[in-house]
């Protein structure tokens, strides 16, 4: 989210590489092991080594409910890829762990820990208001799916790299590591999930992470059919930063018009006029950056758009300025991410109780929810300036279902920009999707028990090839009265949305 902050200068948030993606499952404790597996025990961890890639191994241990009352089996550990070490936290489904799907969650940034998504949004437990414990989350996504949370890329959260080794600096490199992680996770550690449907979810810079990881999975499955196959079925992208150009374009509509929850425009006529005048030049230089993604060119384009459009709001998006780019109707409560829950979470994950349970290695000195080093590394490349359009198009053409869901109060990765970007994706369903109007969708609210309108949506189901045996779904779903983190703002609606999607149900 810090990237969000700077980026929302805007470029940064956009590109979220899709790349963490582990699958999960297992119910035995200890984990079951067959004779063909290479497994050792060390300092309380079981260590599984890949038969396909000997330099890859996973350290894993089972957790009880002392640090997170998950209502199901849970495991933590690290994937070791030579000098790189990725931390994960895995929860079996509370419903049917044998048959329910696997869902990976990736928080964005770049540089933000997926523990934010776990302990603030969709995990089975949430950090309490004091930052000294957790409470059960009745709307956690593990009620219907096994959930895997990974701190990625290396250098984020509890993940770390050996001294002297570089950290990944773009979405593709991150996706390569995550794909290997998934292969080892489902083939060696939890082989009973090898054939389970797999979904990739996340938010913000996840708009890059998710498509990149999804594309890596599809390509590697085709190239190496004899290696473990990750059974990717769909991607769920929440307020994704997909394209810097489109996100910036959406600033005017988000700040200068109204929508449910916004009774009058946030900006006055003077500021809206300034943005409108500067928009053509910003779009021109952004297009130059897109076609020539050299870091110097794109940084120059970013400066133009920041000065004339995004900076008019973003420079005031902190505690002092009072504005909140993640929810334009509420004030910023804490610098960097604007939400105090992030600080509570960070405090909790640094307690002795948690460290005794997780057993981080000596290389991990403390937990931080944001990594300046990873943010800086990505910022030196053109990764955040290049939209994830090609990866999304590739996934759709390979029959991977995609849902983009949007909290309408978000500015950082706004609804207006992402809807325009979605219409511009060149694929077989483009014409039909663009021609459709958004229609209301309903959800039964926990507060009233009534089936009420909660947003708008549209969807197409397209047979992408003549030989396709099923239609590929692409859905755009909005949620009113929610900002950048829909599951935090409207947990019951977000759970309903996720459950309908992975079970193949419609929204209207």
UniProtKB/Swiss-Prot annotation:
PROSITE patterns according to UniProt: CARBOXYPEPT_SER_SER
Protein's name in the database: Carboxypeptidase Y homolog ARB_05721
One Pfam family of this chain: Peptidase_S10
GO CC, alphabetical: extracellular region; fungal-type vacuole
Coiled coil feature spans: none
Record keywords, A-Z: Carboxypeptidase, Disulfide bond, Glycoprotein, Hydrolase, Protease, Secreted, Signal
Secreted as UniProt keyword: yes
EC number: 3.4.16.5
GO biological process, one term: proteolysis
Location in or out of the cell: Secreted
Gene3D superfamilies named in the record: 1.10.287.410, alpha/beta hydrolase
InterPro entries (UniProt xref): AB_hydrolase_fold, Peptidase_S10, Ser_caboxypep_ser_AS
Protein residues bound to substrate: 413, 485
Intrachain disulfide bonds: 282-305, 289-298, 332-338
Entry superkingdom: Eukaryota
Organism: Arthroderma benhamiae (strain ATCC MYA-4681 / CBS 112371) (Trichophyton mentagrophytes)
Active-site residues, as the UniProt record annotates them: 204, 410, 484
Signal peptide (UniProt feature, chain positions): 1-25
């Amino acid at each position: 989210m810090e990237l969000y902050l700077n980026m929302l200068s805007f470029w940064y948030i956009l590109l979220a590489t899709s790349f963490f993606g582990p699958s999960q499952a297992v119910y035995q404790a200890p984990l079951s092991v067959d004779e063909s597996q290479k497994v050792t025990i060390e300092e309380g961890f079981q260590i599984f080594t890949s038969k396909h890639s000997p330099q890859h191994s996973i350290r894993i241990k089972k957790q009880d409910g002392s640090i997170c009352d998950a209502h199901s089996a849970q495991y933590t550990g690290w994937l070791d890829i030579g000098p790189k070490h990725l931390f994960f936290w895995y929860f079996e489904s509370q419903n049917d762990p044998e048959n329910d799907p696997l869902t990976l969650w990736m928080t964005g940034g770049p540089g933000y820990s997926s523990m934010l998504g776990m302990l603030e949004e969709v995990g089975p437990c949430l950090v309490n208001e004091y930052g000294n414990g957790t409470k059960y989350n009745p709307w956690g996504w593990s009620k219907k799916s096994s959930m895997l949370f990974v701190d990625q890329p290396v250098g984020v959260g509890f993940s770390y790299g050996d001294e002297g080794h570089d950290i990944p600096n773009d979405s593709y490199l991150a996706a390569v590591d995550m794909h290997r992680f998934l292969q080892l996770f489902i083939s060696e550690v939890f082989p009973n999930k090898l054939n389970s449907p797999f979904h990739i979810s996340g938010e913000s810079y996840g708009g890059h992470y998710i498509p990149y990881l999804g594309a890596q999975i599809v390509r590697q499955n085709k190239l190496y059919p004899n290696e473990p196959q990750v059974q990717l079925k769909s991607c769920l992208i929440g307020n994704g930063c997909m394209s810097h150009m489109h996100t910036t374009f959406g600033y005017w509509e988000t700040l200068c018009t109204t929508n449910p929850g916004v009774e009058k425009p946030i900006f006055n006529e003077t500021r809206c006029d300034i943005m409108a005048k500067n928009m053509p030049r910003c779009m021109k230089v952004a297009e130059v950056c897109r076609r020539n993604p050299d870091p110097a060119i794109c940084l120059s384009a970013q400066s133009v758009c920041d000065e004339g459009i995004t900076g008019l709001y973003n420079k005031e998006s902190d505690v002092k300025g009072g504005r909140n780019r993640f929810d334009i109707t509420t004030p910023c409560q804490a610098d960097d991410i604007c939400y105090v829950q992030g600080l509570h979470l960070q405090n909790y994950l640094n307690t002795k109780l948690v460290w005794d349970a997780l057993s981080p290695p000596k290389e991990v000195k403390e937990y931080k929810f944001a990594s300046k080093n990873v943010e800086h590394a990505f910022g030196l490349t053109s990764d955040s300036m290049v939209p994830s359009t090609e990866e999304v198009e590739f996934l759709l053409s390979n029959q991977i279902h995609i849902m983009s869901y949007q909290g309408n109060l978000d500015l950082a990765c706004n609804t207006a920009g992402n809807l325009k970007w979605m219409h511009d994706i060149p694929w077989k369903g483009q014409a039909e999707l663009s021609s459709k109007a958004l229609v209301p969708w309903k959800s039964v609210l926990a507060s009233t028990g009534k089936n009420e309108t909660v947003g708008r949506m549209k969807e197409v189901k397209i047979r992408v090839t003549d030989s396709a045996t099923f239609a590929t779904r692409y859905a755009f779903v909005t949620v009113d009265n929610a900002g950048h983190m829909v599951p935090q703002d409207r947990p019951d609606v977000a759970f309903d949305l996720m459950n309908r999607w992975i079970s193949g149900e419609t929204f209207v």
